[in-house]
Amino acid sequence: MKNKSLSIASIAALTMGFLIWGCTENSSSATKEITDQDRESIYYQELLYNHFLLSAYYYDAHLKNELNSDPDVYFKVLFTADFSKGACTSRYADVCGMYNQMSDRYTRYYDPEFSDGIMKALTESPESVGIGAEVDVIDNALVFTEIFRNSPAYFAGLQEGDIITAVNYRTITSQADYEEAIQGQKLDIIKIAYIRDGESHTAVIQLDSFNAPTVHLAYKSGIPVITIDEFTDITANEYGTYGEFHERLQKIVDNGDKSLIIDLRDNGGGTIEHCENASADLLSKGEKLATFVEATWDSVQSGIQNKIVQKFDTTTDYAEVDGIGKDLYVVFLANENTASCSEIMLMNITSNKASPIVGTTTYGKGIGQGYSETFAGGIFGITDAHIFDKNGETYHSFGIEPDHLIYDPDKQMAKAVEIATLGTEKRTAGYGKVSTGNFDKEAAGESSEAKVLDRDYIRRGAGSFRFKKVAN
């Protein structure tokens, strides 16, 4: 295999010198004149670079003949089809147009004007302003149950188990009193009186912003419940979502618990590394995780020239060591919004441990995206992989069925607690047999009128993703 570090000039030479992709053209060649000045512009170079990316990495580019082999076909053509995927200013509208010709709803482009916000949404958990702690009523006392790492409460020295007695000299008698008392703006000062080991203390805390945690631990009728909101690189923990999960799992193991409920309801996914590592924490050394069939590229000799061709690599992840939670009995909660990376975790654990699932059929997204920066500083997300379980099966477009189909959220939790308490039930359901409808043609696009370029929209468009190292 050749070194995969191509300059934009190399890509241009390969693209203009000969037909580098062996697919049939899906529209006629461009008839408009493209001047030398056009070709030297950053806008044309960005189009050319993204054409290479789609040709190399987009899973269906050649399998379904979706991408025209001539990048000039797309230059300065403002397509009207589905501009809800990604975001472009007028200068890069043809790049968005090219991406929007691909049928896959998760293959999208954001031009340089949006790139900072896009990367922040993909890599960081939401920011909050406050002290950064969770509380609960334990034995009629209001107690800190979690102090978020790198939060104002963390730096003020507060610890789990501290008993709250007053906030700003106001006696706290309920959780509602506490929540009201700690409200404020960034840089406001809050004084919290608390008891630790029978001694009274006061913490002076300046409210500030911090990355919210994505993993939460609570107990229901004596059963530990880990709720994972999303899988993200930068959170309250320096190691992201996986770091949070590992810490909470260690607490459960240290506590001697035998069963665990993992709540993945409304978890739309995130960075694949985190759901794979979290899965490995629950498995034994050598057990199979996900298998990825991934589109990539290679250069081959064609006469006196090099030719770039798309190919598909298959890789499988394994648990490299015994996970700290390998002996735990696990029950999952899932629903129709459980998607992508959270479905990978469900797939990994249920295929290895036959862990039961309570809730509703999941979303059914068994494909993955590669994200990275482009030549001009934009951001691309390209569907480049299909995902399979240890047996070579996929839930894509059909979802993962629950063992207990229950619609009411409270009843879902009650059933999960019942199963976890007994700790004997094995999974008997499988993947869905009927399409969830989420990948039907009519469901492929979101209304551009309704689109708001916010964090939720960006992460819905990403799902399960990895950050790629590509040509530069």
Per-range role (PLM):
Residues 134, 145-159:
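Mobile, glycine-rich extracellular loop/lid and propeptide segments
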Residues 357-397, 402, 410:
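BRCT (BRCA1 C-terminal) domain core and associated BRCT-interaction motifs
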